[in-house]
């Protein structure tokens, strides 16, 4: 069972991916992790990737697909996997298909932009411990202070509204196109992944219940 989760940053994909991994005993595959592992192990593809990256270039889709094929052939992927951060573009999705890598489920977790901004820009962190708060959903006992130490909380650069809106812009211009791509594939029928859209405004538990219902049908 190979799964792709789509949705904007902050939609809850990471949380749901962890729950899926635990329930179905499948790994979450990150292209970044694959690249780092291949470079560390000195594999042929890893050495090629290292050379490209050291020269300031972008690792090609062809090379990434090669890494994906190596990764999914490993024993822990026998029951399937969740793709994390890949594909990001239609050419990458087409490259997956052309390499004969089948996808069983594509699930979109939909959340409006303004809710994403609210979720992410409200986060505050205690740098020393990594404890994370939210000014509305999980506020500290004393505004701006860590509950344990009383030290100042900070807003990470990634959680600034300007940064969030830039990330959303990138999502809409690139990755969101995959929604239409996979909807079309699902409609085509034979050997196509299923496509489902879930309302990410609901609680984690409710979204999880719907996700599991979809995946249990074809387990």
Curated annotation (Swiss-Prot):
Record region (LID): 122-159
Q: Which InterPro entries match?
A: Adenyl_kin_sub, Adenylat/UMP-CMP_kin, Adenylat_kinase_CS, Adenylate_kinase_lid-dom, P-loop_NTPase
Q: Which GO terms describe its molecular function?
A: adenylate kinase activity; ATP binding
Q: Which residues bind AMP?
A: 31, 36, 57-59, 85-88, 92, 156, 167
Q: GO biological process annotations for this chain's record?
A: AMP salvage
According to the record, the residues making up region (NMP) are 30-59
- Quaternary form? Monomer.
PANTHER family hit by this protein: NUCLEOTIDE KINASE
Per the similarity annotation, which family is this? Belongs to the adenylate kinase family.
Instruction: Identify this protein by name.
Output: Adenylate kinase
What species is this protein from?
A: Acinetobacter baylyi (strain ATCC 33305 / BD413 / ADP1)
